[in-house]
């Protein structure tokens, strides 16, 4: 959620920045609602002042034995007016808040202007694409050759965009998550969490996934009569429960930054993505991801974004996978993000780069929603934390990259050296 101060004092600047994210701010509506809010606030305070003054007069008159009937009638009238004014003010504040929840975060000043992904800026490349002296197979064919990736079984069990992975590829899949968690906890300073895969609506509002992305989520309601009012949602990312661990808390500055990581399944309905990335494992309804989150002081958040992106890059480097780092333009930057880097790994079968990590600085956008603050040591004032989140990495897409980049001519797969200790020394799959 944006700082209300910005809308009250710099609304033209805010409107311009939001327009760069393809969001049209209703400036007149915001100004009109703010003017009415001020009027109702002043009216409420005025009525409270009059009531207080009248109450003093009543007390004095009562002490002197005077008739207070008319005075009491006047106070009752004031109470009715005050009740009505409070109700109008409360309803207006709810309307303002509902609209505020629809506003995306403001892009940082150094984010390049652009309308969509074609305007993103490539920052760097690491490594070189491998060269092969045989026809390249994609991960779907490689999975078919090994017999370890079964899309037909996924459709049978659940439907399209589901898969069954077994045997050696399943071991490799598990090894990837263990490798990533060990790297982030042992070398990068993150604390590992086990989290609920179902969350409540409050948690999703806290991260900005609601109300905007309602149709992209899987919602669950119990048929048990005792729990029928409880509506849960399958997490789209571990970012949701991790960020909400900060909710309604005040942290000591001395313990910052907080660095958290978790490996969870993620569930996305992918509404509106029909026809996009439908090949194989690239865009599934259910996938696994190692997530990183940092909660940090505002003045350190951009440095933390660079650090977290390097943590994600380290995974790709240790796996010796060619990738590029991309700075997203304003129009492609996510709803809650002020600045985002994508890491895209090379897929030789399609001659394309595929996103395996997205690292974002959400500034105080999420912490304002969840009321996550810290106490400044110098002035003892409460301030909103900044949060950084990033994939470290998406397991399924990283698996795709390994299968395709480490394939041999006969369809077998070489195990990356950094994963062999997690595979009991196995060097070749198939």
From Swiss-Prot:
It comes from the Bacteria. SUPFAM superfamilies: Class II aaRS and biotin synthetases, tRNA-binding arm. L-serine binds at residues 237-239, 291, 391. It catalyses: tRNA(Ser) + L-serine + ATP = L-seryl-tRNA(Ser) + AMP + diphosphate + H(+); tRNA(Sec) + L-serine + ATP = L-seryl-tRNA(Sec) + AMP + diphosphate + H(+). GO terms for cellular component: cytoplasm. PROSITE patterns: AA_TRNA_LIGASE_II (PS50862). Keywords: Aminoacyl-tRNA synthetase, ATP-binding, Cytoplasm, Ligase, Nucleotide-binding, Protein biosynthesis. Pathway: Aminoacyl-tRNA biosynthesis; selenocysteinyl-tRNA(Sec) biosynthesis; L-seryl-tRNA(Sec) from L-serine and tRNA(Sec): step 1/1. It is found in: Cytoplasm. Its EC number is 6.1.1.11. GO terms for biological process: selenocysteine biosynthetic process; seryl-tRNA aminoacylation. GO terms for molecular function: ATP binding; serine-tRNA ligase activity. Its main location: cytoplasm. CDD domains: SerRS_core. Gene3D superfamilies: Bira Bifunctional Protein, Domain 2, Serine-tRNA synthetase, tRNA binding domain. The keyword Protein biosynthesis applies. ATP binds at residues 268-270, 355-358. Consists of two distinct domains, a catalytic core and a N-terminal extension that is involved in tRNA binding. Catalyzes the attachment of serine to tRNA(Ser). Is also able to aminoacylate tRNA(Sec) with serine, to form the misacylated tRNA L-seryl-tRNA(Sec), which will be further converted into selenocysteinyl-tRNA(Sec). Homodimer. The tRNA molecule binds across the dimer. Belongs to the class-II aminoacyl-tRNA synthetase family. Type-1 seryl-tRNA synthetase subfamily. This is Serine--tRNA ligase. It comes from Baumannia cicadellinicola subsp. Homalodisca coagulata.
């Amino acid at each position: 959620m944006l700082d209300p101060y910005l809308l009250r004092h710099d609304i033209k600047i805010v409107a311009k920045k939001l327009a760069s994210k393809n969001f049209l701010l209703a400036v007149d509506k915001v100004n009109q609602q703010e003017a009415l809010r001020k009027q109702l606030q002043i009216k409420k305070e005025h009525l409270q002042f009059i009531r207080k003054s009248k109450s003093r007069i009543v007390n004095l008159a009562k002490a002197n034995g005077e008739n207070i009937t008319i005075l009491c009638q006047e106070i009752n009238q004031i109470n009715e007016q005050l009740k009505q004014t409070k109700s109008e003010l409360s309803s207006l504040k709810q309307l303002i808040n509902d609209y505020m929840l629809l506003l995306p975060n403001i892009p940082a000043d150094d984010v390049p202007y652009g309308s969509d992904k074609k305007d993103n800026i490539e920052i760097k490349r690491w490594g070189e694409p491998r060269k092969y002296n045989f026809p390249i197979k994609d991960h779907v064919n490689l999975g078919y050759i090994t017999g370890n990736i079964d899309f037909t079984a996924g459709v049978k069990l659940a439907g399209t965009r589901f898969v069954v992975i077994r045997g050696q590829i399943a071991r490799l899949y598990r090894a990837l998550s263990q490798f990533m968690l060990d790297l982030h906890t042992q070398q990068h300073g993150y604390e590992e969490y086990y989290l609920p895969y179902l969350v409540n609506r409050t948690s999703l509002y806290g991260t900005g996934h609601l109300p905007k992305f309602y149709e992209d989520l899987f919602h669950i309601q119990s048929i048990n009569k005792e729990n029928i009012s409880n509506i849960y949602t399958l997490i789209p990312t571990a970012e949701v429960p991790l960020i909400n661990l900060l909710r309604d808390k005040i942290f000591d500055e001395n313990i910052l930054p907080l660095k958290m990581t978790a490996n969870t399944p993620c569930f996305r309905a992918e509404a509106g993505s029909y026809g996009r990335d439908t090949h194989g494992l690239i865009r599934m309804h259910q996938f696994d991801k190692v997530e990183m989150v940092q909660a940090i002081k505002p003045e350190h958040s951009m440095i933390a974004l660079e650090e977290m992106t390097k943590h994600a890059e380290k995974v790709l480097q240790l796996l010796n996978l060619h990738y590029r780092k991309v700075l997203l333009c304003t129009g492609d930057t996510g709803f809650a993000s002020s600045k985002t880097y994508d890491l895209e790994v090379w897929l030789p079968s399609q001659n394309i780069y595929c996103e395996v990590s997205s690292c974002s600085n959400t500034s105080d956008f999420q912490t304002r929603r969840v009321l996550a603050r810290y106490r400044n040591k110098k002035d003892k004032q409460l301030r909103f934390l900044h949060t950084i989140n990033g994939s470290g990495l998406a397991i399924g897409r990283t698996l795709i990259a390994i299968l395709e980049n480490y394939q041999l001519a006969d369809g077998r797969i070489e195990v990356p050296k950094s994963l062999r200790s997690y595979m009991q020394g196995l060097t070749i799959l198939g």
